[in-house]
């Protein structure tokens, strides 16, 4: 839902890469090349960034029920 702060598997901090990764991929660059240039080498970290879906915009449309 929110940006991944750390890799779910190894715990490496990833939040500092998210904005640049997202903007470059939305600009049409190859995600593989972007991750290589950012220095994200571990496959678990790459998976965490590639698989993230920013669903917070969809979820916040719903009314909060307690």
Swiss-Prot record:
GO terms for biological process: DNA-templated transcription. It catalyses: RNA(n) + a ribonucleoside 5'-triphosphate = RNA(n+1) + diphosphate. InterPro entries: RNA_pol_su_RPB10, RNA_pol_suN_Zn-BS, RPABC5/Rpb10. One of its GO terms (cellular component) is DNA-directed RNA polymerase complex. Its main location: cytoplasm. Keywords: Cytoplasm, DNA-directed RNA polymerase, Metal-binding, Nucleotidyltransferase, Transcription, Transferase, Zinc. Binds 1 zinc ion. It is an enzyme of class 2 (transferase). Part of the RNA polymerase complex. Belongs to the archaeal Rpo10/eukaryotic RPB10 RNA polymerase subunit family. DNA-dependent RNA polymerase (RNAP) catalyzes the transcription of DNA into RNA using the four ribonucleoside triphosphates as substrates. NCBIfam families: PRK04016.1. This is DNA-directed RNA polymerase subunit Rpo10. It comes from Hyperthermus butylicus (strain DSM 5456 / JCM 9403 / PLM1-5). The lineage of its organism: Archaea, Thermoproteota, Thermoprotei, Desulfurococcales, Pyrodictiaceae.
């Amino acid at each position: 839902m929110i940006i991944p702060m750390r890799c779910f598997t190894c715990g490496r901090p990833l939040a500092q890469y998210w904005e640049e990764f997202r903007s470059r991929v939305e600009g049409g660059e190859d995600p593989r090349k972007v991750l290589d240039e950012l220095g994200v080498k571990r496959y678990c970290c790459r998976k965490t960034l590639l698989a993230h879906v920013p669903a917070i915009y969809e979820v916040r449309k719903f009314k909060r029920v307690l």
